[in-house]
Design a protein with these regions (language model features):
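Arg/Lys-rich, alpha-helical DNA-contact motif
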Residues: 2-27, 32-36, 40-106
Length: 106
């Protein structure tokens, strides 16, 4: 698997790149308050115990983008969005495992 997590805005994002709280908010074009609310509701789980220590990875960018689309397009609240995002990630993990298991029988 490539070490590239994704492509956003024409930039390749390495999976080991980390952003602090303010830097991440600016990069996502999101207000700090909205970002903190996403964290409080479980949409995002940054590394670090305190806001000053929080850091975010490339996968968090995709979660923010998806969360904002779900809220805007479908009117889903943040608690619901957190559940949906977790289920989507679980589905992806299961899909990877299924493909690996199917490949073992080829």
């Amino acid at each position: 698997m490539s070490r590239i997590e994704g492509v956003l805005g024409g930039q390749l994002l390495h999976e080991q790149v980390r952003w602090g709280l303010r830097e991440f908010a600016v990069y996502c074009r999101i207000e700090l308050g909205e970002l903190v609310e996403m964290i409080e509701m479980g949409v995002l789980e940054p590394l670090g115990a305190e806001p000053e220590q929080w850091s975010f990875a490339a996968r968090d960018l995709q979660r923010v983008r998806t969360a904002r689309r779900l809220a805007r397009d479908l009117g889903i609240n943040l608690a619901g969005i957190a559940v949906i995002l977790d289920l989507l990630e679980e589905r992806e993990r299961m899909s990877v495992r299924l493909r690996a298991a199917a490949g073992a029988f080829d």
